[in-house]
Design a protein with these regions (language model features):
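Active-site C-terminal subdomain of aminotransferase-like
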Residues: 1-52, 58-66
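Conserved C-terminal alpha-helix-loop-beta "cap" of PLP-dependent enzymes
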Residues: 45-129
Length: 135
């Protein structure tokens, strides 16, 4: 009779860690998390909306995606960089800034707030703004 986790060579410490992580996840207030992420996305959108050639929208979260996200669209005839150039420039920052670039060829990128704290949101907005206001 093999115990749970034994076929995968999992020790009791790892199994207890997994169970504790699950307990913490279940205790977390998911509505509060959604509100926190939505507020961070709103801050990103509000900060970037005032830049020339930039428009933003907030996705709904829920069934569409785990967290509400800020979708940023560039009018590449107005902005000093194309979206692809901006994404590349952000990745050269120190520390690097990674945004969702699946639609960069279409002039859109996404800022996902899930792994950002309030200070990091400010940094991301600052770096995007700096790149889009340079000539």
């Amino acid at each position: 009779r093999q115990g749970i986790g034994r076929p995968l060579k999992i020790g009791k410490e790892e199994l207890v860690g997994l169970l504790r992580a699950l307990e913490l996840f279940l205790e977390e207030d998911q509505d509060a998390k959604q509100d926190e992420w939505r507020e961070r996305s709103r801050r990103v959108a509000a900060s970037l909306d005032g830049l020339g050639g930039v428009s933003t929208e907030i996705t709904g979260g829920g069934k569409v995606s785990v967290a509400p996200e800020a979708v940023v669209t560039l009018d590449e005839e107005v902005t000093p960089l194309t979206c692809v150039e901006l994404v590349a420039a952000l990745r050269e920052e120190e520390p690097r800034v990674f945004v969702g670039a699946d639609a960069a060829e279409d002039g859109r990128f996404v800022v996902n707030p899930m792994c950002l704290d309030d200070d990091q949101v400010e940094y991301v907005v600052e770096r995007i703004s700096a790149q889009l206001t340079t000539d």
